Swiss-Prot record:
Record organism: Bacteroides thetaiotaomicron (strain ATCC 29148 / DSM 2079 / JCM 5827 / CCUG 10774 / NCTC 10582 / VPI-5482 / E50)
Free-text disruption phenotype from the record: Phosphatidylinositol dihydroceramide (PI-DHC) and phosphatidylinositol diacylglycerol (PI-DAG) are absent, phosphoceramide (IPC) levels are severely reduced and ceramide levels are increased. Inositol absent from capsular glycosyl residues. Abnormal capsule morphology. Results in a mild growth defect. Sensitive to cathelicidin LL-37. Abnormal RNA level of genes involved in capsule biosynthesis. Does not appear to affect production of outer membrane vesicles (OMVs) or OMV cargo selection.
Membrane-spanning intervals of the chain: 12-32
Topological relation to the membrane, as annotated: Single-pass membrane protein
GO cellular component, as recorded: cytoplasm; membrane
Signal sequence, renumbered to the chain: none
The protein's name in its UniProt record: Inositol-3-phosphate synthase 1
GO molecular function: inositol-3-phosphate synthase activity
Amino acid sequence: MKQEIKPATGRLGVLVVGVGGAVATTMIVGTLASRKGLAKPIGSITQLATMRMENNEEKLIKDVVPLTDLNDIVFGGWDIFPDNAYEAAMYAEVLKEKDLNGVKDELEAIKPMPAAFDHNWAKRLNGTHIKKAATRWEMVEQLRQDIRDFKAANNCERVVVLWAASTEIYIPLSDEHMSLAALEKAMKDNNTEVISPSMCYAYAAIAEDAPFVMGAPNLCVDTPAMWEFSKQKNVPISGKDFKSGQTLMKTVLAPMFKTRMLGVNGWFSTNILGNRDGEVLDDPDNFKTKEVSKLSVIDTIFEPEKYPDLYGDVYHKVRINYYPPRKDNKEAWDNIDIFGWMGYPMEIKVNFLCRDSILAAPIALDLVLFSDLAMRAGMCGIQTWLSFFCKSPMHDFEHQPEHDLFTQWRMVKQTLRNMIGEKEPDYLA
């Protein structure tokens, strides 16, 4: 059934938590450069991908649904460091100076607002550009005012808030996360052990009718309290943890093994990474949050309860090592021990020398544009159709997450078809 989608009129504010970080600045530079014809938005589904229509015609996704034009985006956000986007991008050393200079004026105009930050949630970071708030509730109120002020100052019709900041320490789901009333009480009581800064950003965004995207593996909007609030406010939420490198490869390879009914004995994964994200993950408490996210992938694809002979005893290990000389150029190694006909063993080795932020930047942009589309289409709560972009896709307690990349891609296209009242094409015709 065709949905009524409000047109993408006016300007869209994109407020990024961690706007001075490597992923954020890479996304911003690429978007601005694309607007000026200085670069192509390679890796962006919203800008380059096509989908087949009911009549078997192939169309660009951006021609099928009314996405916000890149020219209508206004960037802003928060950071614990005061550097403008040009200075921050120079520090990150992801992009060449000549690429930054093409949009230097626009980058220098993007100056971060003081961040809502608690050192206890990211002990390896020591920022100075930080809000002073007596309670988590006061922190929320300050963030809400920031959103309102940015929207007014930049004449934005709509806003999306994107978390592209560091991974917070691991915490389990607790009673304070189980209902909106309990969450708000914990914020007002300043329960800093269970209410993270990222939860304050998410609450503030939803309260201001802004879709929220969680790009890290933090426990944040994947709680009953946030589900309740997002449905109450009719706001989309999505995440979590950008699926950009090693885990992307896993969600391609694991479905292949399962489709061919090849068994797996073990999967060992390790990485070296030298950017600020790697530095934060060098702390065991922060790494555990990431580890849980990365480990969750293959079980739901393999379904060992259905195929115990093939996947009933898979040894899965994930490691991330902070190695400053590599900076943003992450290297990932995977050793996969598989077995085939009559149980004979084989091995697959994958060595992925990737650029972390180059892979994550288009994911961040696509999640922003699709979240804005979902808001205009009246879709609220968890956006499971955006699982394609995430390591640890959000889901409620009644459902399992979908990790198979190809099934996830079909979910994206089918959701877009449903929005415009299109049927899936007949691939047998």
